[in-house]
């Protein structure tokens, strides 16, 4: 795979949706009508199937592995919520009890041997196992924004990255056309191009990207966004380190760090105000919004991917316990369909 195409591939791989098509000419008709298909009854699932096919076309089918965020490893730990967050949400996440967490760190894209220093999103998936038996998922990436405001953008970008049959490479004119036609891609693309990759997952912030609704005991809703801030501080590779970095270092760095004690993140919740975007994960909220500490995540172990408790978890971001609800963000809802298809395929391959 040529370098320029690889960089664009990983740049769109921020969630379990991102990749590009390498052999999708039969789906051209679908791509020409992605907006109408995605918005029609059953269309969300059709686009999700096409996206998963595209992942396999771009990266190959790696049996038993996730179609995206393929490279990663597992972890376990616990979360303790705050009373302040409990005033805004009746979720058991914020009862103040220690909640069991199973997690996974990952690199965007469908390449199981991706370089740990590539300029692509890093992921953190968390499953909270509440004492009442309910499950709650939080799935995040390390960029503050996403690249697409609608599901149709996915296939548009994948088709722009399709290999030309004659050259075996993506057509630069199609890539340029995509960039021009989809300005919602620009913010994340710029972030990845100008921000060096993290030196360790322990030094990596993670963003929920979407807007969610907290529901309190009286039924009042509050729009929120959240991020997880590393207690060890944020740290990116320097330019010199980026050049010299080995292909593999993230697993070893986390193993070494967790041996020293729990690796912690603070969950920071931002309170939305009227006019703040509810349904567009490419748009950041203005600075200066009220923020609260909603809890502390502590991770205490490392496990290789397929030996970890996270291996069989879907990390569907629409898996929410009572007290937290989704907005009408079409990308958030689309992720659920795409994750389910990826999960189903890999489970049948094990």
PLM features: residue spans?
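Active-site-adjacent core segments of small-molecule enzymes
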Residues: 2-19, 24, 29-350
